[in-house]
Amino acid sequence: MASDKPRNNDSIGKTLLVVVILCLVCSVVVAGAAVGLKAKQQEQRLLDKQRNILAVAGLLQPRMLAEEVQQAFATRIEPRLLDLQSGEFLKQDPATFDRSQALRDNQMSIALTPAQDIAGIRRRANVVEIYLVRGDGGQINKVILPIYGSGLWSMMYAFVAIDTDGKTVRGITYYDHGETPGLGGEIENPIWRNQWIGKRLFDDQGQPAIRIVKGRAPANDPHAVDGLSGATLTSNGVQNSFNFWLGENGFGPFLKKVREGALKNG
């Protein structure tokens, strides 16, 4: 009996060694898979972003392959960094800018006061990435601005395409939100989105004038868009988002320069 104890101990030791080795191997495999998956997810997020920008620019064709999306984006879309306070472009490479990081940095963003924070976003980065859309001849024919604000249930993220006159909407797409399907979720509805095309964001005095109205918008009103049926709070969120981002704490200074012709010779 006594002679069996060393062999039992050896067996237990070998078993523990095998378990440790298996754990290490599994850890390496899982870590490697996680790194690879994260890279793939980042690549997919970038592709989705490019698709949404091309879509709002009117450049996304049906069933475009990933390579075609990337090529169209590279040839027709020019990302630029914009200083919101001055309304001027920066020379910094947009690829080096991280909005999430900027919002966490007190030097790169500002906390909004309750009076300022009509969109319910709490903080606003000092710098924003926007997108210039170029035609076949290389001339700028649109600018795409990212806007976001609180809806009923979620933060609603959109891209808005604006003419080089700085006031006429050429397209809008809400690409990320958590509003109620069939109600507030109708911000994704192409019929509702198409109503925005041709609407004027500003009045003749340069004041924000776009309005989400309850019910049907008057056909001859260049500033009015139908409200979302059964989704008053989501409609209010859209209105508040535009009020903020068209104002002095958003893209107001930049769009004033655009209305004065800043992009006409781009």
From Swiss-Prot:
Its EC number is 7.2.1.1. Its cofactor is FMN. The chain crosses the membrane at residues 16-36. One of its GO terms (cellular component) is plasma membrane. GO terms for molecular function: FMN binding; oxidoreductase activity, acting on NAD(P)H, quinone or similar compound as acceptor. InterPro entries: FMN-bd, NqrC. It catalyses: a ubiquinone + n Na(+)(in) + NADH + H(+) = a ubiquinol + n Na(+)(out) + NAD(+). Pfam families: FMN_bind. The modification FMN phosphoryl threonine is found at T232. It is found in: Cell inner membrane. It is an enzyme of class 7 (translocase). It is a single-pass membrane protein. Coiled coil: none annotated. Its main location: membrane. Keywords: Cell inner membrane, Cell membrane, Flavoprotein, FMN, Ion transport, Membrane, NAD, Phosphoprotein, Sodium, Sodium transport, Translocase, Transmembrane, Transmembrane helix, Transport, Ubiquinone. One of its GO terms (biological process) is sodium ion transport. Composed of six subunits; NqrA, NqrB, NqrC, NqrD, NqrE and NqrF. NCBIfam families: nqrC (TIGR01938), PRK05346.1-1 (NF003746), PRK05346.1-5 (NF003749). NQR complex catalyzes the reduction of ubiquinone-1 to ubiquinol by two successive reactions, coupled with the transport of Na(+) ions from the cytoplasm to the periplasm. NqrA to NqrE are probably involved in the second step, the conversion of ubisemiquinone to ubiquinol. Belongs to the NqrC family. This is Na(+)-translocating NADH-quinone reductase subunit C. It comes from Yersinia pestis.
